[in-house]
Amino acid sequence: MATRVTVGEPLRWAVVRVALDPATGHEQGGTRRALVVSYEPFHRSGLATVCPITAARDEARYPGEVAIPVGTAGQTRPGLILCQQVRTISLERVVGAPDGRLADPGLRRAVRLALAHHLGLDTPAVGDGALVRD
C-alpha cells in the first residue's frame, strides 16, 4: 500500500487515515482516521502506535474515549478517539498525508490520561507530560 508519510516525518499527534483490515472480533476495522500517539524515535522502525477515531458518537461512554470536536485536525463530524483500541501498525497502513494535528493541550492531556487509565499506568505522571514531552 502506498503511503505519503516517511520515516522521520513528525507524526506524534497527527491525525492520519489508516487501513486497519483485517480486523477480528471487536477491533476497529476498515479505513478510518486515527491519532498517532507514539513518539518520534519509534517511527524510525517503520511502525506507529495509533488510536482509531470514530464518528459514530459524540459523547464518551467509557474512560478510554476522548471526544474530538468538529474542526479539530480536519474532523468534519463530532467523534471519539478510542484510546481503548490503541494498536501498533506499520506505516505502510497509512493512506495519504496527515489530515491535521491535535494541537489542543487539553485534548492531548485527555488522550494521555485515557491511555494511562486503559493501560493501568500511574496517571499523574503521564497526565502532566512528565514521562514523554511533546
Tell me the role of every PLM-derived stretch.
Residues 1-134:
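Conserved functional hotspots at enzyme active or ligand-binding sites that engage polyanionic ligands
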